[in-house]
Amino acid sequence: MNTLQLTKKQDYTIVQLNRGKVNAINQEMVQELRRTFQELHNDPDVKGVILSGQPHYFSAGLDLIELIQYNETQIHDFFAEFGTLYQEITQFSKPFISAITGHSPAGGCVLAVTSDNRYMAAGDKYVIGLNEVAVNIQISQNLTEAYAFWMGGGLANRYILEGKLLSGNEAVSAGLVDALLPLEHVLGHAELKLQQYLKADQEIWINTKKKLRKHWLNKLDQNPKNSLKEAAALWWKPEIRAKMEAYVDSFTNKKKK
């Protein structure tokens, strides 16, 4: 695989996002994540999964530099597949923990909110959040339900409309993140929590997770093309397109310096 690195342990697998320094999400990463989680779901020897990133970046979100070059069909296909990935890992029944090794805005947060626990690297420079409104990407109804599940409807409503990125301390206070740890301890702490879960009877644990998520899952639009059709359509709105192109130009110019 080109965007992921798998580490197999005795009873679980660590899936590390491994696409450059910032793990920007593109079509290939989405496809590899879908395929990997399907295989891990079907593998009886895998009892749980940890999703981790690179040092300082869990994922910087969508790869706008690549996506801005997609044509209309490619954009619709991308959002449909990204929406499908979100639904599939939200419904992943085995223990699933995110080791957030740094920044996790927008698309990075989309991946993280599907997991059962989130442990994040401590540090003032690291942020997490569904800041789609602030970067002119239409958030889906399915994503708003995830935020509300973890932090409650009122706080989720406020933070989504503000396009707010949360510091680690804010994320813990809101219930979005379980704990902050030194960067070098994040993965190890996630493994300890997963090992705790694996001591329980697997069938009972999985049944309990399904019961806890029942109301959340019942609210999901099961048609990924429908859930993100607004995002795909608004991608081509001239004012939004101009802002995205300006952002991409400014970012690529910084990289050249």
Specify the residue positions occupied by each region the protein language model found.
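Catalytic-core regions built around general acid/base machinery
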Residues: 36, 81-93
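Glycine- (often His-adjacent) and acidic-residue-rich active-site loop
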Residues: 45, 52-85
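Glycine-rich beta-to-alpha transition loops that act as phosphate-gripper elements at the mouths
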Residues: 99-105, 160-165
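C-terminal long alpha-helix characteristic of the crotonase
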Residues: 120-126, 177-225, 250-257
